[in-house]
């Protein structure tokens, strides 16, 4: 399955929530005046009753789109989350949050996860001093992520840092924006992760 490259607000409207696919800190209903309508020519208003399966599928699609992960990748993350000790849903979110592109975004070096992914693929990011270009690398506690010297003057990185200052940096990450460098202190606890995600619906979907 190819990665979606169409209008970002369309995906957020489909899921009925801000997937944080666009830069900026404006509320979802300000970013798009059609927030309460599904995409499509006739954009039906939300509120109709959905089946249990539909709710589970929508939650999976929502999370997959938030993190920019393809279907097969997401399925593999779920299998890994189910294999290790602990709550499967929480494990899944930890795996997604520990992706290098997500950590780059959380540190404020990219204004969106897509932009952070591009920085990684263009080798503008270093991991423990080495340039890398694989966005899905699992970052571990103590790993140091930094913007490569040759990319430090990029305007988009400076803009992203300004947005991050408004958005806030998670407690499980330590960042020095003056050096464009940060440390992944530990995998986040569930309380540190987005409350609007209902991972239990995803577990129910894959458990069928």
UniProtKB/Swiss-Prot annotation:
Q: Which Gene3D superfamilies match?
A: Ribosomal Protein S4 Delta 41, Chain A, domain 1, RNA-binding S4 domain
GO term, biological process aspect, one: ribosomal small subunit biogenesis
CC terms in the record's Gene Ontology section: small ribosomal subunit
InterPro entries for this protein: Ribosomal_uS4, Ribosomal_uS4_bac-type, Ribosomal_uS4_CS, Ribosomal_uS4_N, S4_RNA-bd, S4_RNA-bd_sf
Entry annotated with the keyword Methyltransferase: no
Q: Does the keyword RNA-binding apply?
A: yes
Domain S4 RNA-binding stretches? 98-160
CDD domains listed in its UniProt record: S4
The record's PROSITE patterns line, in alphabetical order, gives:
RIBOSOMAL_S4, S4
Where are the residues of the annotated region Disordered?
A: 24-52
Annotated GO MF terms: rRNA binding; structural constituent of ribosome
> Which UniProt keywords are given for this protein, alphabetically ordered?
Ribonucleoprotein, Ribosomal protein, RNA-binding, rRNA-binding
Q: How does it assemble?
A: Part of the 30S ribosomal subunit. Contacts protein S5. The interaction surface between S4 and S5 is involved in control of translational fidelity.
Chain's role: One of the primary rRNA binding proteins, it binds directly to 16S rRNA where it nucleates assembly of the body of the 30S subunit. With S5 and S12 plays an important role in translational accuracy.
> Which NCBIfam families does the entry link to?
PRK05327.1, rpsD_bact
What family is reported?
Belongs to the universal ribosomal protein uS4 family.
Could you identify this protein by its name? Small ribosomal subunit protein uS4
The source organism is Acinetobacter baumannii (strain AB0057)
